[in-house]
Amino acid sequence: MLTTASSADILTLSPARGLRGQVSIPGDKSISHRALMLGSLAEGETVIHGLSLGEDPRSTAACFRALGADIPELNSECVRIQGVGLDRLQEPAEVLDAGNSGTTLRLMLGILAGQAGRFFAVTGDRSLRSRPMGRVVEPLRQMGANIWGRAGGNLAPLAVQGGSLKGIHYHSPVASAQVKSCLLLAGLLAEGTTQVTEPALSRDHSERMLRAFGAEISVDVAAKTVAVVGGSRLVGQTVQVPGDISSAAFWLVAASIVPESELLLQDVGLNPTRTGVLQVLQEMGADIQVEKRREVAGEPLGDLRVRSARLRGCSIAGDLIPTLIDEIPVLAVAAAFAEGTTVIRDAAELRVKESDRLAAIAQELSRMGAQVTEYPDGLEIKGGIPLQGAEVDSHADHRIAMSLMVAALAAQGSTTLRGADCARISYPDFIPTLQRLINPSSAS
């Protein structure tokens, strides 16, 4: 049973006795951002089906409306965008507000840096203003960008004076799709070729979509390098956004740890740079089958059937981390219910997300009785200890909020979650969907 307090931000959850039904997974947030951006930069019309309606893509749409793109009110059925062309964004009179979305802000910086003769100011909410922007600002400056801001340009608000850019070969110290995508977008407007080499390959939605829109882009998998040639002309396309595997992950873990559960998750994106969560859960013993594999608009997808299972601990580290970075909080929940010990390393990137996700999930699971050891770059979780309902907090982070809701479903006793409403950032219908799926026999 779920009970919402009058503030609508405090949620009380009781243990569930079974999750059953079908779930239509909301559109992939990463792909939605990129479709909105490239549709705005393309010539002609771009049609997007299945767009995510979370707050983050709405922030992207609002920013690009202010930059001159014709973007109607968002819906998940069909959104038609009239683009303005690659280098013809208008200078807005207002500050561009990315809200809580690091993807919006970081990728937009790459686009704005090459808009010669125009000035832009960008900011975000309190959380985003505390997150590091130097990881994209520094390589953009190497390309010739003029960007200023707090802490030497590491923190928003930031000011951008658009100008001429030159291609560079950048060796990123972290495997980050946001860094890579920012520089590829800047490279579209730069003279020559822009190359990005990563320590491990991050998600490749930008490369796939840029190629579909007409950019001259190449990928050297062995060298972990992506290159884009400046001066490409982008042409509007039809984009079908698959379901977000990061959103599906909450249901995969929930159905695995709540007894007598069986869920069918429909139309989930199965891009190989994103499916680490499936690999890890199956290694832990989860009962997950992929059905109806297919490819739509260059992205693989399928349906996922998941049933309750006994999980066991495992090791999560190395090149696997970029393929499941957003799913680590809910995988920590799975680890707490698994027999044995789970060790997560090489995940220091989680400390600079919407919250310090390593610290947040360690703190809140510990409140529920889990044995969690925190490392600078990861966690060690000793599973098999029954979790107890407790008062927990989302840390204003949507992925922490939904992970704790999943933990509450299999804990003993009721759990009260503060800050539940932030789930809307990426998954507006998560709580109503959860209520629908809970077996009626669990109601009290």
From Swiss-Prot:
The lineage of its organism: Bacteria, Bacillati, Cyanobacteriota, Cyanophyceae, Synechococcales. 3-phosphoshikimate binds at K29, S30, R34, S176, Q178, D326, K353. It comes from Synechococcus sp. (strain JA-3-3Ab). Gene3D superfamilies: Enolpyruvate transferase domain. It comes from the Bacteria. One of its GO terms (cellular component) is cytoplasm. Belongs to the EPSP synthase family. GO terms for molecular function: 3-phosphoshikimate 1-carboxyvinyltransferase activity. One of its GO terms (biological process) is amino acid biosynthetic process. This is 3-phosphoshikimate 1-carboxyvinyltransferase. It is found in: Cytoplasm. Monomer. It catalyses: 3-phosphoshikimate + phosphoenolpyruvate = 5-O-(1-carboxyvinyl)-3-phosphoshikimate + phosphate. It holds the Pfam family EPSP_synthase.
